[in-house]
Structures are given as structure tokens and as C-alpha cells.
Design a protein with these regions (language model features):
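Extracellular beta-strand/beta-solenoid scaffold signature
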Residues: 81-86, 109-117, 133-140, 157-171, ...
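Beta-solenoid repeat scaffold
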Residues: 72, 86-102, 120-124
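Leucine-rich solenoid repeat scaffolds
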Residues: 338-395
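Short, tandemly repeated low-complexity microdomains enriched for cysteine and small residues
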Residues: 28-34, 56-60, 217-218, 255
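Short, T/G/N/S-enriched strand-turn elements that build extracellular solenoid repeat scaffolds
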Residues: 64-68, 83-90
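Short N-terminal "domain-start" leader segments
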Residues: 1-23, 30-31, 39-42, 47-52, ...
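Small-residue (G/S/T/A) turn/hinge positions that recur once per unit in extracellular repeat modules
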Residues: 91-94, 121, 143, 173, ...
Length: 396
């Protein structure tokens, strides 16, 4: 193959290679998932230049801001756009490979719209590059069974009155995989969000850090961003596993209560977010705005609380408020929440390592078993049988 080659290390730490023509234009790039070492990338590049490479090669396409992607596409340079969306994936079963390059909003349009939108598509992969300075880095809107992988999503900040303020958003979309991304300095909502009826999604092995940004245009709003949040309603059967979540303005990993507008009376009849699995995560040092838990099942008086959640084998240390917390169920819950907190470790948190706000009955129907906590707010959180309500020994 004519041309000269170069190897490069992407923002995700994975090595890849490119082939350049004599003009300096990139004419081919590796179409695989990258290499863990520089030597492996170089060896494969040499095979390509010798004509012996049998792996996938993607043709380089020159892209324009706002372009619709309808076929396999790899960036050949950075892309700077006057606001978002910068790129819209509008066809099923295609790969958008950023090739280690950066898609960003220009300095005067920071926070305006999303960077990359997957619009009602299935079977799409977006990978290997950086998306920054939009209202959100990547939005999966509808569709399903897509992959967002090995991206750096940073400095995406929502403006007042805008729809976003997140790193990666899954909006009414199911069976997607969000894996191996670095998601940092986004806000004021979250690093990664699952909104609406988003089911059977996998959020795996991401580094989610320092998501605590202010709203653009209103310095009094923001810094309440959550690391990973399942908002719903009907955000069910999702798996959040292997992530490292630190430095969130509010809570690290959160399942929120639900309230469908117009529900009568006061949220009654809203479906809970339920059957979600939170496992093998590290969620430390969250709550930089002054209040935040490592992992939280969040509710307030009227919205319907999360139910049937499993929180298993996580670490939640040094958070501003609690390590792992289940808020008291709201007034309109259709029945016991029946969450399970099993085999976790939490130490050095500001209030309690383990917290359950349900006091009548103690811990409701939630199960706390085999956890390593040094401080809890009531005995049932330690896995001990709760005494009769009203006893002086109810509290720890």
C-alpha cells in the first residue's frame, strides 16, 4: 500500500495507526478496536504497508459540521463547530470512529446543543476520540442496541433553558452499551444519564470524574451534577458495573424517584425505576458542592421511590454525606421498595457509611446483608434484626 504510516495513542490510552499520502492527507486508518501496546500497532501497520494486512481498513471521509452519517466513517482531523449537533448518525449499523481526533464546539458557542446525536438508530458504534464543549457530548435519542466506547467526553456544560448538561445521555433508548469512556467536567446534571424509558442498558468500566460544573449564563445554578444517574421514569433493568466515579458535585451513582406530569394525586401512579443492578463500582469523594452520597436511591415526599434495586460489591469511601443511602420511600409508593444492599464496603463518609431513611417499619422491606460499614444510622442497616418500633434501641 502506498503511503507512510504513523502510530498514535488515543485519548482512551489505546494505540492505533494511520496511513498518509505524500501530501500529508490521511488515506486509511485501522478499523479495529485498537491495540494495547505501541509495538502491536506498529507491527500491524508494517503488515499493511507491505500488503499483507487482512484486517478491516476504513476509508477516510472529510466531514462538515452538522453532517448526517449514513455509512462507516472515520475522522481524518479535528472538527470544530459553531454549536451542536456537530454530527448526526442517521443510519443503522454504522461505525463512527473519531480516529483519536477531537470534535468540539467553538469558544463562543460552548454549551449549545449536543456534539454527536444518534437519532433513532440501532446497531451504531461511536468510538475512539474526544467530544468537548457542547451541551452534551453524545446523545442516544431513541432507537437502541448502540455502543459508545473509548471516548473522552469533557467540558460539556448546559446553558440555562437548554435541554442538556451531561457527558453522555441515553434518552428513551434501550439495550445500549456505554463502555470504557472517560467522562469528566460536565454538568450541571450528570456525567452519564439514563432518561425516560431506557431499559437493559449497560454502563461499564467508565471513569467518571469531577462532574460539578455551573450552568452557563447563571453562576448561581449548578454544581449539583451526579456522576451516573438513572432518572426515568421506567429506567429499568439497567446494569452499572465496573465504573470509577469521583468528584461529583452531588451524588456519585443515583437512581432517582419518578413523577409523571399530570399524575394524580401528586405523582401517584407513576412507575418506579426498578430492577437496576449497581455492582463492582468505586464511588468515592463525591459531594463536592457540600452534600453527596457515594451511591443513593433518591426520593422525596411525593415521587415514587426506586424499587427492586440491587447494590452489590461496591466501594463507597470518603463521600461528603453517606457512603450508600436509601432515602425514605415517598407517600405514593405502590408497595414495599424491596431494594437489596449486599457485600459492599464503605468507610470514612461524612455522616454514615450505610443509611436507610425508612423508620416505620425499620428499613422497610430493604435488605442489608454482608456489608463492611463502620457507621450506620440504624441497626437494620448493619444486617441485624430490627427491634420493635419505638424501642430505645432502634437507633445506633
Amino acid at each position: 500500500m502506498a503511503g507512510t504510516g504513523e502510530v498514535y495513542k488515543g485519548s482512551d490510552g489505546v494505540w492505533g495507526f494511520r496511513v498518509k499520502a505524500s501530501t500529508g492527507q490521511i488515506i486509511a486508518t485501522d478499523g479495529g478496536y485498537g491495540y494495547t501496546s505501541k509495538d502491536d500497532a506498529r507491527a500491524t501497520l508494517q503488515l499493511l504497508l507491505q500488503g499483507d494486512y487482512a484486517g478491516p481498513i476504513y476509508e477516510i471521509a472529510t466531514l462538515a459540521c452538522g453532517q448526517e452519517i449514513t455509512e462507516d466513517t472515520t475522522l481524518d482531523s479535528d472538527l470544530v463547530c459553531a454549536g451542536g449537533p456537530a454530527l448526526v448518525v442517521a443510519a443503522d449499523n454504522v461505525t463512527l470512529d473519531l480516529g483519536g481526533y477531537t470534535v468540539s464546539a467553538s469558544a463562543d458557542t460552548v454549551g449549545s446543543g449536543p456534539g454527536i446525536v444518534l437519532q433513532g438508530v440501532t446497531g451504531v458504534t461511536v468510538r475512539k476520540g474526544t467530544v468537548q464543549n457542547f451541551g452534551a457530548a453524545v446523545v442516544i435519542a431513541g432507537g437502541g442496541n448502540n455502543v459508545v466506547q473509548n471516548l473522552t467526553c469533557q467540558d460539556n456544560v448546559g446553558s440555562v433553558g437548554g435541554d442538556f448538561g451531561d457527558g453522555i445521555v441515553v434518552d428513551n433508548s434501550s439495550e445500549n452499551r456505554i463502555e470504557g469512556n472517560t467522562v469528566r467536567r460536565n454538568g450541571p446534571y450528570s456525567g452519564i444519564s439514563l432518561l425516560g424509558e431506557s431499559r437493559h442498558n449497560q454502563v461499564l468500566d467508565n471513569i467518571v470524574s469531577d462532574n460539578n460544573m455551573l450552568h452557563l449564563g447563571d453562576p448561581s445554578a449548578g454544581r449539583q451534577a451526579m456522576g451516573i444517574r438513572m432518572e426515568g421514569p421506567k429506567a429499568d433493568h439497567n446494569t452499572v458495573s465496573g465504573n470509577t466515579v469521583t468528584g461529583s458535585g452531588a451524588d456519585g451513582i443515583v437512581v432517582l424517584p419518578t413523577c409523571i406530569p399530570g399524575s394524580e394525586p401528586e405523582c401517584a401512579g407513576s412507575p418506579p425505576n426498578q430492577h437496576n443492578l449497581i455492582t463492582n463500582n468505586i464511588s468515592n469523594d463525591n459531594g463536592t458542592s457540600g452534600r453527596g452520597d457515594g451511591i443513593r436511591l433518591f426520593t422525596v415526599a411525593n415521587p415514587v421511590a426506586p424499587a427492586h434495586t440491587t447494590i452489590r460489591e461496591n466501594v463507597a469511601d470518603e463521600n461528603q454525606t453517606n457512603g450508600i443511602a436509601i432515602d425514605a420511600a415517598g407517600n405514593n409508593n405502590p408497595g414495599p421498595t424491596e431494594n437489596r444492599v449486599i457485600g459492599n464496603s464503605a468507610h470514612g463518609n461524612g455522616a454514615y457509611d450505610g443509611f436507610d431513611g425508612n423508620v416505620n417499619p425499620r428499613c422497610d422491606a430493604n435488605v442489608w446483608e454482608g456489608n463492611d460499614f463502620r457507621s450506620v444510622n440504624q441497626r437494620c442497616v448493619s444486617g441485624e434484626p430490627a427491634p420493635a418500633s419505638g424501642s430505645r434501641s432502634d437507633e445506633v
